[in-house]
Amino acid sequence: MMGALSVALGVLAPATATADPSSNVQPSAIDRLMFSQREAERVMGVGLPNVQRQSATFALDTDRPDCGSVVLASVSSYDRSPYMAAHSQALWDHPGWYTLVDQSVAVFSTDEEARGFTRSEADRWRTCENQTINVSELAVDGSVLQATVDVRDITQVDNVLAVSYARNDSAYAFCQHVLLSERNVAIDIRTCSTVSKSDGERAFELMKIVGPRVWEV
């Protein structure tokens, strides 16, 4: 995981910052920080014709609220923070999905608020490191999924926080969850696949696409 993080950091660091580093990203720029359907399909290697977008994070309940958003960018976790605006999107291949991708972007008033949020999340994620938790997630089709999640090691290098986990509800899925804090923005991406571990752990690849955009808005 450390090697992948180092690669990700190298790609995310802007060669030339086109935005004024002393200025803040505005809430109106959120949509420019979201990956496109085509970008997600290219990274995941499958068609993702189903798309859901919303001006909020995701609904998720867990028996371990002290673990924050280790599974998914959740309303209960993000609403503890003073973010100004948040958008989320979920893309999947078909009902019941073999491949699922979701992303949340939150804009804060200051860089320090964004960093403070991700620092708090890092502490919460580590609370559940190498443990099993139970979650109740509002699925993309509106149903409620009960799942058991086996959380793996939590890894952090600079402003990139990552975890891989196995999720078991009606099917067994491999997932990767990555959180980036850059400027006054937090970007949260999760990828899941029921096909293989390598297919499920591609959140880094999507973060390499959208992370540098924080310096372009």
Question: What is the role of each PLM region?
Answer:
Residues 87-119:
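A short acidic-to-branched-hydrophobic micro-motif
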Residues 100-102, 170-177:
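Short, surface-exposed coil-to-beta transition loops
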Residues 190-217:
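Surface-exposed amphipathic alpha-helical segments
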Residues 86-93, 174-182:
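Short, surface-exposed beta-strand/loop micro-motifs that present aromatic residues
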Residues 47-49, 55-62, 125-172, 216:
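Short Gly/Thr-rich strand-loop-strand
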Residues 18-92:
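N-terminal "mature-domain start" segment
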Residues 101-104, 180, 184-193:
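Short, well-ordered beta-strand elements
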Residues 1-19:
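Secretory targeting and sorting signals
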